[in-house]
Amino acid sequence: MAKEDNIEMQGTILETLPNTMFRVELENGHVVIAHISGKMRKNYIRILTGDKVTVQLTPYDLSKGRIVFRSR
């Protein structure tokens, strides 16, 4: 799958789940389950409830995503 196929959306962390998974509410109101991308995990980027994040979604499964950026 090419990087161009991903859909990027802004969202807010609703709750923290086990295994670095998060429940994220997107701008359009949908709630998805997202995990942290590898580079964020490698650099120990901490994500807390209420943080604004950028989530990448795949067109194949819009209920799961990957957190790629945490806004300040």
UniProtKB/Swiss-Prot annotation:
Entry keyword Protein biosynthesis: yes
Please give the positions of the paired cysteines in each disulfide bond.
none
Residue ranges annotated as transmembrane are: none
What the record says about family reads: Belongs to the IF-1 family.
Q: Which InterPro entries match?
A: NA-bd_OB-fold, RNA-binding_domain_S1_IF1, S1_domain, TIF_IF1
What role is this protein assigned?
One of the essential components for the initiation of protein synthesis. Stabilizes the binding of IF-2 and IF-3 on the 30S subunit to which N-formylmethionyl-tRNA(fMet) subsequently binds. Helps modulate mRNA selection, yielding the 30S pre-initiation complex (PIC). Upon addition of the 50S ribosomal subunit IF-1, IF-2 and IF-3 are released leaving the mature 70S translation initiation complex.
Keyword Cell wall biogenesis/degradation attributed: no
Organism of origin: Shewanella loihica (strain ATCC BAA-1088 / PV-4)
Gene3D superfamilies the record matches: Nucleic acid-binding proteins (2.40.50.140)
Localization per record: Cytoplasm
- List residues of the S1-like domain: 1-72
Instruction: Cite the record's note on assembly.
Output: Component of the 30S ribosomal translation pre-initiation complex which assembles on the 30S ribosome in the order IF-2 and IF-3, IF-1 and N-formylmethionyl-tRNA(fMet); mRNA recruitment can occur at any time during PIC assembly.
The name under which this protein is listed is: Translation initiation factor IF-1
Query: Could you tell me which SMART domains the record lists for this protein?
Result: S1
The record, for PROSITE patterns, names: S1_IF1_TYPE
Its cellular-component GO annotations read:
cytosol
Q: Which UniProt keywords apply?
A: Cytoplasm, Initiation factor, Protein biosynthesis, RNA-binding, rRNA-binding
Query: Per UniProt, what is one GO molecular function of this protein?
Result: rRNA binding
